[in-house]
Curated annotation (Swiss-Prot):
Keywords: 2Fe-2S, Aromatic hydrocarbons catabolism, Electron transport, FAD, Flavoprotein, Iron, Iron-sulfur, Metal-binding, Monooxygenase, NAD, Oxidoreductase, Plasmid, Transport. InterPro entries: 2Fe-2S_ferredoxin-like_sf, 2Fe-2S_ferredoxin-type, 2Fe2S_fd_BS, Beta-grasp_dom_sf, Cbr1-like_FAD-bd_dom, FAD-bd_FR_type, FNR_nucleotide-bd, OxRdtase_FAD/NAD-bd. It catalyses: phenol + NADH + O2 + H(+) = catechol + NAD(+) + H2O. Binds 1 FAD per subunit. Pathway: Aromatic compound metabolism; phenol degradation. GO terms for biological process: aerobic phenol-containing compound catabolic process. It comes from the Bacteria. Residues 3-93 form the 2Fe-2S ferredoxin-type domain. It comes from Pseudomonas sp. (strain CF600). The gene is dmpP. Residues 102-201 form the FAD-binding FR-type domain. This is Phenol 2-monooxygenase, reductase component DmpP.
Amino acid sequence: MSYNVTIEPTGEVIEVEDGQTILQAALRQGVWLPFACGHGTCATCKVQVVEGEVDIGEASPFALMDIERDERKVLACCAIPLSDLVIEADVDADPDFLGHPVEDYRGVVSALVDLSPTIKGLHIKLDRPMPFQAGQYVNLALPGIDGTRAFSLANPPSRNDEVELHVRLVEGGAATGFIHKQLKVGDAVELSGPYGQFFVRDSQAGDLIFIAGGSGLSSPQSMILDLLERGDTRRITLFQGARNRAELYNCELFEELAARHPNFSYVPALNQANDDPEWQGFKGFVHDAAKAHFDGRFGGQKAYLCGPPPMIDAAITTLMQGRLFERDIFMERFYTAADGAGESSRSALFKRI
């Protein structure tokens, strides 16, 4: 049994299979509704039911309050149709978004690389190429691990038959612990994707700033490789933050790219390097490196941020003080079920991010 869901104001119609959520069906049919967490805690995918009956699912009471339930609002990531539906969604069409449909893939681990003491590079050969846009992510399923985990793609879209993921070891994390300690080359895994709307806005003028911290380097790496492969002539500057030299990974890749491409600059920053006499680069936090590099003036540029929430919030503050605005700054924040829907899970400065 399946039901048709009409999405207003665009008028698009999707077919939702029995037991499938509205969001799952939409993404797999190339219809991109706003979403973030995917499990009912952040409220990004809230929509209005205009006609029809729906099971609201396991939506958090913080993300979907009682009064909103009475008003027939639902979270698309949890809601399962019980009849044909008409819903109203805040669909913000972006001319630069390619909207590749989400599909399921099988893969085999082709390489495991120690990028740093806490970050491992996971390479997976897929059963077929996966079209995606640089900056997007996949949901990875692992043997014996409940649920899926989201990891950004580090490879460029031109190499879409083998994906590269950067996995930071999280203390107590079942999935990251499994990847770091048990997963082996040749093991079979499954994944779905692509997900996410973190991508370079090619139609928008302005030079590009990338600020990355930790394993958050993955998306900027994919974006920068894609831009340079396509011959983009805008000035591109990557600021990569880490605690120390051991945690600063793939620096040789970006140094080599900077040597070959005059429009690309690479600025690494270490925030625990005061006792490292051999470190000749920037000493301090990565947002301060960006401020120093541009003398605190960022006007006319577009910024893409990826990393731990404290780094992102500090970078947003620095960029806005340097005359960038909400429309100039892009990021994607991953949520876990433990994050809840509190204000701390979003930027205190922007409504959009």
